[in-house]
């Protein structure tokens, strides 16, 4: 009999995200958008400080569906052959299957679980579809799991500062790894040394310009219009006139 799925995987699939936190109903920004893999529950930003030593996975929203960053998810489970999408230069993967209103058969690959049209060489449209495929075919998800003892939130995640101490604020402000764009070859990792698990993994493998914006001021425009820095007037009255210079009164076009 195959080993059951890990508890955090079931929680990631079953928990409801982007709903109000019942423990912080009156607080602002209380949407649950983090999954604690150790407690197997969803968290809001106000809950995060009490779980700061646990493995935390941020859940994002894309076209009204829950997604997770591919860089974070592949630390937990093999995500090869799962189609990823790009949001703000970060690759994300859908957590659950997405319903389709109509079936469209054309050229290309199709999802192994829901028949959704995919780009080559992908054969799964979501994490849930791959897990279902593996469980039905191999009865064991263990060969696809990866050992992950620490998982922190990204630097773009905002935690209410009034809930943190000075030491915690400094800890959360330390640099973390950034998103690496691009697909990398996935290595098989197994939590068990059983030969059957290695065989299942092998069988599956065979199947399948930084821009800086500056505020424009009247003085800068005046200096820029001069041919050289020597031509810029040093008279305070001229400088004041340049800074306070405004367009004339707008003229309305005559009515025909």
UniProtKB/Swiss-Prot annotation:
Record localization: Nucleus
Gene Ontology terms: cellular component: nucleus
Highest taxon of the lineage: Eukaryota
InterPro entries registered for this protein in UniProt: PLATZ
Record's keyword terms, sorted: Metal-binding, Nucleus, Zinc, Zinc-finger
Disruption phenotype: Small root meristem and low root growth rate.
Induction summary: Induced by RGF1 peptides.
Zinc finger annotations (B box-type) as residue ranges: 21-59
Keyword Zinc-finger: yes
Tissues of expression: Expressed predominantly in root meristematic zones.
Gene Ontology MF, one: zinc ion binding
GO biological process terms, semicolon-separated: maintenance of root meristem identity; regulation of reactive oxygen species metabolic process; regulation of root development; response to peptide hormone
S-S bridge residues: none
Main localization category: nucleus
Function in brief: Probable transcription factor that plays a central role in mediating RGF1 hormone peptide signaling leading to the production of reactive oxygen species (ROS) in roots to modulate meristem size and root growth, probably via oxidative post-translational modification of the transcription factor PLETHORA (e.g. PLT1 and PLT2).
PANTHER family xref list: PLATZ TRANSCRIPTION FACTOR FAMILY PROTEIN (PTHR31065), PROTEIN RGF1 INDUCIBLE TRANSCRIPTION FACTOR 1 (PTHR31065:SF11)
Protein name according to UniProt: Protein RGF1 INDUCIBLE TRANSCRIPTION FACTOR 1
The species this protein was found in: Arabidopsis thaliana
Gene coding for it: RITF1
